[in-house]
């Protein structure tokens, strides 16, 4: 199997072309490949498939290191666009892809950065999914070690984001897994810890569902910015500083799609026997 190793701000991926090669990945194979000591090592595996819809260019599948399939990965989307361009699978600047729960437009800009139309944030609790009687700007979540206030949203995958005074000292290691597996999130959740620097600038750490804390989480950056804008803490354009680097998020509010802009890096190509 031929593959490429890529990263978006340190959030690392193995990307596989399933357009020109036949591949099949049972959960156990994904876990073995994800092992950083005995396999290749990655946060997520991205599969480029032929489009299911003739009006689209590709189908985009994402698997976590634990073998679970997820519907969205923002950093992965940028790497997906870089990969299909580098490999000559398309020469389009605007690339239309489907995911397991929607469609996305990936734009390769003239400056090399990649802008992703992430669609509209979804606030309705049942669609996140999140157990709540009605939408609220903040929800109270109780854990064994701490009770927190957080916003909840879906960016194609479930996110909760809480505001902290200092991301460096935030209790991500303990609180992250407790919130990820909280009973009110039936499909688990990605957990963001957000420090507001000013209305156009935040710092963020993300404990990802099925992957733990990563260097960067694109959909997590989108979720944090959307929640901050919705809560009146942030303006429409936000720089998000993650441990691995920065992303730029733009959202004009309800009824508008949210855009994420950032880099995507090709590290190396390889071949591995399955």
UniProtKB/Swiss-Prot annotation:
Catalytic activity, EC: 5.1.1.7
Keyword Nucleotide-binding: no
Listed GO biological process terms: lysine biosynthetic process via diaminopimelate
Keyword entries, A-Z: Amino-acid biosynthesis, Cytoplasm, Isomerase, Lysine biosynthesis
Annotated site (Important for dimerization): 268
Compartment list: Cytoplasm
InterPro entries assigned: DAP_epimerase_AS (IPR018510), DAP_epimerase_DapF (IPR001653)
Catalysed transformations (reactions): (2S,6S)-2,6-diaminopimelate = meso-2,6-diaminopimelate
GO cellular component assignments: cytosol
Active site, renumbered: 73, 217
GO molecular function terms noted in the UniProt entry: diaminopimelate epimerase activity
Top-rank taxon: Bacteria
SUPFAM superfamilies (UniProt xref): Diaminopimelate epimerase-like
Annotated site location: Could be important to modulate the pK values of the two catalytic cysteine residues: 159, 208
Signal peptide as annotated in the record: none
Pathways per UniProt: Amino-acid biosynthesis; L-lysine biosynthesis via DAP pathway; DL-2,6-diaminopimelate from LL-2,6-diaminopimelate: step 1/1
Binding positions for substrate per the UniProt entry: 11, 44, 64, 74-75, 157, 190, 208-209, 218-219
Pfam families: DAP_epimerase (PF01678)
Function comment: Catalyzes the stereoinversion of LL-2,6-diaminopimelate (L,L-DAP) to meso-diaminopimelate (meso-DAP), a precursor of L-lysine and an essential component of the bacterial peptidoglycan.
Record-stated family: Belongs to the diaminopimelate epimerase family.
Subunit: Homodimer.
The name this protein goes by in its record: Diaminopimelate epimerase
Species of the source: Mannheimia succiniciproducens (strain KCTC 0769BP / MBEL55E)
Lineage: Bacteria, Pseudomonadati, Pseudomonadota, Gammaproteobacteria, Pasteurellales
């Amino acid at each position: 199997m031929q593959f490429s190793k890529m990263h978006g701000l340190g959030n690392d991926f193995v990307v596989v072309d399933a357009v020109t090669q036949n591949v099949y990945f049972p959960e156990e194979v994904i876990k073995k490949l994800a092992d950083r000591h005995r396999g290749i090592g990655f946060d997520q595996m991205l599969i480029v498939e032929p489009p299911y819809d003739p009006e689209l260019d590709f189908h985009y599948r994402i698997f976590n290191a634990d073998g679970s399939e997820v519907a969205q990965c923002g950093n992965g989307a940028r790497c997906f666009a870089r990969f299909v361009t580098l490999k000559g699978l398309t020469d389009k600047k605007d690339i239309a892809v489907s995911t397991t729960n929607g469609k996305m437009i990936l734009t390769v800009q003239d400056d090399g950065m990649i802008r992703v139309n992430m669609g509209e944030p979804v606030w309705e609790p049942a669609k996140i999914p999140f157990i709540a009687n009605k939408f609220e700007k903040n929800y109270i979540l109780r854990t064994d070690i701490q009770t927190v206030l957080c916003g909840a949203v879906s960016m194609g995958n479930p996110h909760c984001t809480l505001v902290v005074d200092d991301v460096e000292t935030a209790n991500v290691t303990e609180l992250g897994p407790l919130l990820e597996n909280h009973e009110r999130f039936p499909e688990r959740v990605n957990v963001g810890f957000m420090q507001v620097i000013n209305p156009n600038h935040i710092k963020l750490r993300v404990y990802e569902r099925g992957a733990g804390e990563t260097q960067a989480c694109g959909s997590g950056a989108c979720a944090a910015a959307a929640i901050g804008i919705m809560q009146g803490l942030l303006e429409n354009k936000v720089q998000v500083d993650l441990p691995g680097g920065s992303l730029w998020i733009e959202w004009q509010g309800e009824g508008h799609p949210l855009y994420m802009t950032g880099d995507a890096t090709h590290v190396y190509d390889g071949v591995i026997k399955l």
